[in-house]
Design a protein with these regions (language model features):
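Phosphate-binding site of ATP-dependent enzymes
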Residues: 199-295, 299
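C-terminal active-site "lid" helix and adjoining low-complexity regulatory extension at the edge
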Residues: 301-305, 314-370
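Canonical positions in the second alpha-helix
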Residues: 3-5, 37-38
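Glycine-rich phosphate-binding loop of ATP-grasp-fold ATP-dependent ligases
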Residues: 157-160, 184-210
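Short coil turns that delineate tetratricopeptide repeat
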Residues: 9, 42-43
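Conserved N-proximal alpha/beta basic substrate-recognition cap immediately N-terminal to
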Residues: 47-54, 62-169, 176
Length: 370
């Protein structure tokens, strides 16, 4: 077997680094998305195949700057021979290697536009099935979602407007926000970051300059604050995966902070929080209500993605308060401690559904493609 070059080994290492290892570890979840800012993948290579039967040949499309869906736990290297193509690093005229399926793993429309545009050109030249068509992913940026998903019955989206830091730092910053329909408190975010990084609340007009100056990038997102806080002072963030047209509840995080993330919440310390999450995972429709479930199904249909997820809260009237809906959602394994045992079934169902979808899409054409 030919010895792999150093650049090839580097590419494969980065491919595995996209997978976080613990749902309650901040560093693990952040590592999956830090790569979009801090490292570059420069080569396209084939991953090792470890199976004994003839493999299913799969092309995986990724971005050089990150924003990719973690897939190592979904693609069994004893089943798939995976060729990873970094779309924004190859020629637009490049030929795809022999394949039976294309998995577009580029998930973040806000930071991966060049890679997605290149991916659109690549998939136009294949007749094989494509999971997560890049043209559909391209429509899932935060600004675009805030506009199109507000038309879904029972869904409340946050007004989201891109603004330059220069405008926000100027004396006219508060007035500009007011003209766009914002009021305080409101949120500012640097595009392309996840896990709560560079995402802050601006409580008053007097805080605007300091907060805007603290964020990286010259283009920021001004976002309406959707208050999901209940009378007891807690806020909830539900995550539901949308896989092959079906909904899979994944987790519920409860926190006294407005910015709710699983790894910063008190889920590990609060047995009553975990009991509420267990009820959500066991019977999503009863916890959310049929109105919210219908709204989630409509969101899934509107997104048009094979693999995606949605983070949201609930209003007092049962409306979905949409925080995020796209393909970048991570399915993380729960810890092995006994108090996380109730989470394993839901996680297994979501991962199993994704794996079954991938094999189904490829298997339908396996014999024909060989």
């Amino acid at each position: 077997m030919r010895r792999r070059s150093r650049s090839m080994r580097l590419t494969l290492k980065h491919t595995k680094d996209w997978v976080p290892c613990c749902p309650t570890s901040e560093t693990a979840q952040q590592r999956a998305f830090t790569l979009k800012r801090d490292s570059k993948i420069t080569q396209s290579r084939a991953c090792p195949y470890r199976g004994h039967k003839p493999p299913i040949h799969l092309v995986q499309l990724v971005s050089s700057g990150g924003g990719n869906i973690p897939t190592a736990h979904l693609l069994d290297d004893a089943v798939f021979q995976t060729s990873v193509i970094v779309t924004d690093q190859v020629s637009p005229l490049a030929r795809l290697p022999p394949h039976q399926l294309v998995f577009n793993a580029i998930g973040d429309a806000d930071c991966c536009e060049p890679a997605l545009r290149a991916a659109i050109g690549l998939v136009e030249r294949t007749k094989m099935p494509v999971i997560n068509d890049p043209s559909a992913v391209m429509k899932t940026g935060r600004v675009a979602n805030s506009i199109r998903l507000r038309a879904v019955p029972g869904v409340v989206t946050a007004l989201t407007v891109p603004m330059t830091k220069q405008v926000l730092l100027s004396p006219q910053g508060p007035a500009t926000l007011a003209r766009e329909g914002f009021y305080f408190p409101m949120l500012l975010r640097s595009p392309g970051y996840h896990t709560g990084r560079n995402f802050v609340m601006v409580g008053t007009a007097n805080e605007l300059t300091a907060v805007a100056a603290s964020l990286p990038g010259e283009q920021l997102l001004a976002i309406e604050f959707l208050d999901a806080c209940r009378s007891d002072g807690t806020s909830r963030k539900y995550r539901v995966m949308m896989i092959d047209g079906q909904l899979y509840p994944l987790h519920l995080a409860i926190s006294r902070d407005w910015k709710v993330h699983y790894f910063t919440s008190e889920m590990s310390e609060k047995a009553d929080y975990r009991a509420e999450e267990a009820r959500f995972l066991e019977n999503m429709a009863d916890v959310l209500g049929h109105k919210a479930v219908a709204s989630l199904e409509a969101i899934s249909k509107t997104l048009g993605l094979d693999y995606a997820g949605v983070d949201f809260g609930l209003s007092e009237t049962g409306d979905v308060l949409l925080f995020e809906a796209n393909a970048t959602m991570i399915i993380s394994r729960a810890g092995h401690q006994a108090h996380w045992a109730y989470r394993h079934g839901a996680i297994d169902r979501a991962i199993g559904a994704a794996m079954a979808m991938i094999e189904k899409r490829s298997g339908a054409l396996t014999e024909k493609a060989r």
